[in-house]
Curated annotation (Swiss-Prot):
The family this protein is said to belong to: Belongs to the bacterial ribosomal protein bL19 family.
Protein's job: This protein is located at the 30S-50S ribosomal subunit interface and may play a role in the structure and function of the aminoacyl-tRNA binding site.
Protein name: Large ribosomal subunit protein bL19
Protein species of origin: Frankia casuarinae (strain DSM 45818 / CECT 9043 / HFP020203 / CcI3)
GO cellular component, one term: cytosolic large ribosomal subunit
Gene Ontology terms describing biological process: translation
GO molecular function terms listed in the Swiss-Prot or TrEMBL record: structural constituent of ribosome
Pfam families listed in its UniProt record: Ribosomal_L19
Disulphide linkage map: none
Keywords assigned by UniProt, alphabetized: Ribonucleoprotein, Ribosomal protein
Taxonomy, superkingdom: Bacteria
InterPro entries referenced in this protein's UniProt entry, alphabetically: Ribosomal_bL19, Ribosomal_bL19_CS, Ribosomal_bL19_sf, Translation_prot_SH3-like_sf
Length: 118
């Protein structure tokens, strides 16, 4: 293992759930305003995951008051306090940039149906 890899391994988070593009997430973000600190929740669909290791990022898209909002978060950053999976999406692409042009029902992602154990 290289020296940089061993340094990076120390700062990797272990509490990150397994999620993919198409999944709907609630990202709890730590916001600092002056000397106060609060948690803000950003809920939307994951449109991409990029990079690897410490530098891995993911982008979440939501529509707020008719305007599309996208935020890119570093996966292992301390400003992301918690990631919750709301629902699993069924998509065939790794990058869902095409959602930017779609409106209304067309921009909806199908929910993945899990098989029931018998």
């Amino acid at each position: 293992m290289h020296t940089l890899d061993s340094l990076d391994a120390e700062s990797l988070r272990t509490d990150v759930p397994e999620f993919w593009p198409g999944d709907t997430l609630k990202v709890h973000v730590r916001v600092v305003e002056g000397n106060r600190q609060r948690i803000q929740v950003f809920q939307g669909a994951v449109i991409r995951r990029q990079g690897g290791g410490v530098r891995e990022t993911f982008t979440v898209r939501k529509v707020s008051f008719g305007v599309g909002v996208e935020r890119t978060f570093p996966l292992h950053s301390p400003i992301v306090s918690k990631i919750e999976i709301v629902s699993r999406g069924d998509v065939r692409r790794a990058k869902l940039y095409y959602l930017r042009q779609l409106r209304g029902k067309a921009a909806k992602i199908k929910e993945k149906r899990e098989p029931v154990a018998r």
